[in-house]
Amino acid sequence: MISSKNDDIAAIATAHGIGSICIIRLSGSTALQSALKLTKISNLSPRLATLTKIYSLDKEFLDEAIMIYFKAPASFTGEDVVEFHTHGGFVVADMILNELVKLGVRLAEPGEFSKRAFLNDKLDLAKAEAIQGLINSRSEAAAKILARQMRGDLSRYVEQMRNELVKTLAFVETSIDYADDDLPDDLLEQIKTMLEANAAKLDKIVQISEQRRGLIDGFKVAIVGKPNVGKSSILNSLLSYERAIISDEAGTTRDRIEENFKVGTHLVRIIDTAGIRKNAGKIEKIGIRYSLAAIEEADIVLAVFDSSSASDEQDERIVELVKNSGKKVFFILNKSDLAFKFDLDLSPSIKISAKKGADEIVGRLRDYLDSQDSSEMMLSSNHQIKQCKDASVAIKRALNLLGDELELFAYEINTAIAAISAITRSFERSEILDEMFSHFCLGK
């Protein structure tokens, strides 16, 4: 559990390992005094890089480093913050950190700097989530979306909607207090229009965020088809190394195989699945269930068929399955270097042989992924999506009560305000904050 104390905390803010620079971050009401005790200087000017020698409490020289002082409240945490920019590697940095601990500075817990920034109104929850997401982002699209959220785009969106709901609640509660006076019809219509618009906005942002979740987490691509149509060969070709066992024996792939690779600027997680067929053994049937589950969770499906064989009932079943999945489907006609016998119309399709044609698949994937607009407002976490869904449901319940049950209407609007506010503002339960910030890295 993250401490709620206002004591001085410190952590190494850069990744452990060999590098040219290592940064130690120190925050708290006496951070400056603690930092100066490891030097022979008497003060630091705010926001000015100062080159100085660092000593242990026993006056042993440790390093020559740059120190920067951020005076409260003009710092990341809102407290006094001092940074030591030491030479890289973790040995020297750990030695300096140990000296700070001897002075009574506490080692920070993961996310504690960001939690202090939040508690000191330097950061809201949406921006905090964006910072952590940006640190962990693995594609340009994700970085751009999260940078906009960190800039405050989502926070402004939430605050505008919250203010409209609060204004509505004020009108209604005034009417409840003066029960003899009914709300004017034109005001009821204005409230109805505003609530319908906000519910529609919430539904839209949830839909966009769920549909384009792959822009942040990476797109899942499932390779499906009958046994022995070349799914594993295609996987190996896309990855440019032998990840899956290839055999002429049908049903070689029984376990689900997952690997990440880049398609242009996008992260893709590709899933090779067991072949789908009727007469499968017990273990293979389990693999087939995994295949069906992979289609369900995938953003994109590569449906692979053997173009050198006539189509059969199993092929028709797979075509129907993927077409009804609601996912983006690319039909791959493999073994196109052999005589063409496949007689199902799968236009448009990609004709390849397992060892040739991966570039065309990658090109089609890249074109499709590039077409996914990342400029629209998006929610970056499951928490944000849930809060928007809850707010939308509460608003719709309120609409059904408008003009009749005003006390219940006010309750539902309060519920909607609480749900939407939780995207940027404090939760009532401190343990939820602890859970969120505990996933941050040290020094953040």
Swiss-Prot record:
TrmE-type G domain segment(s): 218-370
Alphabetic keyword roster: Cytoplasm, GTP-binding, Hydrolase, Magnesium, Metal-binding, Nucleotide-binding, Potassium, tRNA processing
Domain of life per record: Bacteria
GO cellular component, one term: cytosol
Signal sequence region: none
Keyword Nucleotide-binding annotated: yes
The protein's name: tRNA modification GTPase MnmE
GO molecular function, one term: metal ion binding
Organism: Campylobacter curvus (strain 525.92)
Cofactor(s) it depends on: K(+)
Localization: Cytoplasm
Role of this protein: Exhibits a very high intrinsic GTPase hydrolysis rate. Involved in the addition of a carboxymethylaminomethyl (cmnm) group at the wobble position (U34) of certain tRNAs, forming tRNA-cmnm(5)s(2)U34.
Residues annotated as binding (6S)-5-formyl-5,6,7,8-tetrahydrofolate: R25, E83, K122, K444
